[in-house]
């Protein structure tokens, strides 16, 4: 990766885990520690050439993508594969589909981890906001967000729905006890307790009395009900909206049509 960013961490710098902790961890993709990126690319030189500026921009995007869209279960490492993807700035790849695919696969993998140090990867902000908006389980007790700056003539400057959860109360209870509590509550939840369409319905989609969402979030709404494989590098997961028709304001047949999602089909 020296050809892309001009340097690479040494083996010692890239290995952010040591001893027994390292042995217990599941295998992770080769990359650079976030601390290494911060040390070497935190500030772009004031007299930087165009090539240096582009390198810093690419590394910054790599850092953000690895920490938000595709974080691994360690939370400490930026895999090289995401940096390679950023060699083409004007690509037309579907980052949203890839993010969802990666999250699905991380949820699959997390269910199979049994070590004390086992973690979960994927976009936890996306998963958290989705859950908080719909399920009365694990939802923060208090939520508020600061007023968005006024720019009435540019809807594309409006925030996304996650901004509603900008400031939340944190849970400080014992993790194991809260896990047991959440599992028990999820096992007993009823359809009537679920907020199926938190973003509004029909022509009011994205507009609530207290919040107005960025219209870019609805740009691809004609694809929301498409049944297809979602692809993210090695991971392939199926998009099966027919299982959750009520999220789209539609009647939910019961049981939904069965689709084989065996592991063999993921490869």
Q: Across the structure, where does each feature detected by a protein language model lie?
A:
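Structural stabilizers in ordered domains
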Residues: 1-267
